[in-house]
């Protein structure tokens, strides 16, 4: 896990979202950063490497959507600098499910 993934995982593990999540979960051959089964929600933490993978990320997100999953993407710097806001954004998505 990257430092940002670890920080988000620690918050999620301490029930910051009020649901159980699985880190590094395999879905259809892809390893997603976090999966929240109760909400069919995937959380991806994107670092600088993802800037060059926009097309790949879009295909992956589209395939996950086709499976009925919602994908929330957050950037490393958001998790490291504004964790409360990231968690609130994730909660808002979960509330709509």
What are these regions (language model features)?
Residues 1-97:
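Nucleic-acid endo/exonuclease domains
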């Amino acid at each position: 896990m990257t430092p940002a993934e670890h920080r988000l995982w620690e918050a999620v593990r301490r029930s910051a979202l009020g649901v159980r999540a699985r880190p590094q979960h395999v879905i259809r051959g892809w390893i997603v950063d976090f999966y929240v089964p109760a909400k069919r929600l995937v959380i991806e933490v994107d670092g600088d490497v993802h800037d060059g993978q926009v097309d790949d990320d879009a295909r992956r997100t589209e395939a996950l959507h086709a499976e009925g999953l919602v994908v929330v993407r957050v950037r490393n710097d958001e998790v490291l600098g504004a964790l409360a806001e990231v968690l609130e954004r994730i909660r808002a998505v979960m509330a709509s499910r």
